[in-house]
Amino acid sequence: MKEAIDLYFDENYGKLYEKIENGKANIFEYVDENGKITNQFLIREIPEKVEGNTFYDLVTPYGYGGPVIHYSNNKEKLLENYENAFTKYCKENNFVSEFVRFHPIIKNYEDFSKMYNAQYMRKTLITKLDEEEPEVNQFGKSCRKNIRQAMNKGVSYRVTENPDSIGSFKEIYYSTMDRNNATDYYYFDDDYFNDILKYYKNNLILIEATFEDKVIAAGLYFTYKDIIHIHLSGTLNEYLYLSPAYILRYAVSVWGKENGYKLIHHGGGRSNSEEDSLYLFKKNFAKLYDTDFYIGKKIWNEELYNKLCEIKNVDPSESFFPAYRKI
C-alpha cells in the first residue's frame, strides 16, 4: 500500500468511522496532465427522499482531511478540471453537498478555499520536536511544575509501541467520557478499537501513566511519517489530583524526540473560543506554535439542496451545514 500524505489521507482511515458516522468511506481520485488530487470522504444517506429518490451527502471522516493536491504543474487548470469532474461525479451519484474539515498542518484549505468557501474556525496547537528541549522551551512554566510534582510523588510512565491489545486503555477512556458527560459519538465501541489495531497497529503508541504499580491514565497516539497525532486519552477519577495527563504529554514528547519525529499535533479546543478549557490545557504543551483550522462547505447540487431544505422547512442560507440536517 502506498504511503499517504498523512494519516488522515490514508485509504483505510475513513473505514474507522463508517459505523460511527453511518456512512461509507470512499476516495475520489482525479489525475490529468496538470496533476493529481484525491478526496477521501464518508457518503451518508439523507433520510428525506425527493420524489421517491434517495440522495446522499459527503463529510470528512473524524479529524481532518478534504481534497488534497499530490502534485501539479498547472495548479489553476488542475483545480478547474477537478471541480468539473467532481461536480459530474456528484450529479451521477446523487451527492448533494459536502462538509470538509481541512488539515491544519498540510494546509490544503489554501488550494481549495475558493471552491469550498473555506472558513477559519480556530487555532490548533503544535509541539516542534526538531528543536532543542521542546519540553523545556515549549511547555508552560506551571505545566513543567505539574510534571515535576507528579514525578516526585511517584508517577511514572511506560510506552508501548505497536500494542497488541488496548483493553485497559478502553476502560480508562470510557470512565473519562462518563466524567465529562460526553455524547454517544465519543463512546467508540469494540469494533472501532479492533479496526484501529487491524489497520494501524504499526502506527500506534500506547502511553500509560502508573502510580504504585497501577495504570492511572493512558493515551493512544497515531504516528505517521514524521508527525505524532494526539488521539484519545483518559485519567481515572481518583487520581486526577496527581495530574497524570501532564505526564502523558511529557512522555509522548520525550519518546517522539528520541525516535526522530518532527512534531506533535495536539488539535484544538471543543469550541472556537481561546478561553476554551481544552484549548488552554493543550496550550500548556505548545506555548510557541499553532496553526489554523478551516472548514469548507460545498453545495454540489443547488436544486436538490433547496428542495431538501424546503422539505425540512429550513432556510438554505442557514449557517448550519448542511441546513437540511439541522432539525
Segments the model singles out, each with a brief description of its role:
Residues 45-64:
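Conserved acyl-donor/pantetheine-binding loop and adjacent beta-alpha core of acyl/acetyltransferases
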Residues 65-75, 130-131, 233-242, 270:
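A short, internal acetyl-CoA/4′-phosphopantetheine-binding micro-motif in the GNAT/acyltransferase core
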Residues 23-25, 92-95, 259-261:
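Short, high-confidence coil segments that cap the C-terminus of an alpha-helix
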Residues 99, 158, 264-267:
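Short catalytic-loop micro-motif centered on adjacent basic/acidic residues
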Residues 42-47, 113-134, 262-327:
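Active-site/acyl-donor-binding loops of N-acyltransferases
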Residues 59-104:
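A gly/proline- and charged-residue-enriched helix-loop-helix capping module
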Residues 84, 193-194, 198-307:
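Aromatic (often tryptophan-rich) hydrophobic motifs at membrane interfaces
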Residues 1-50, 102-241:
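A conserved beta-strand-loop-helix scaffold within acyl/acetyltransferase catalytic domains
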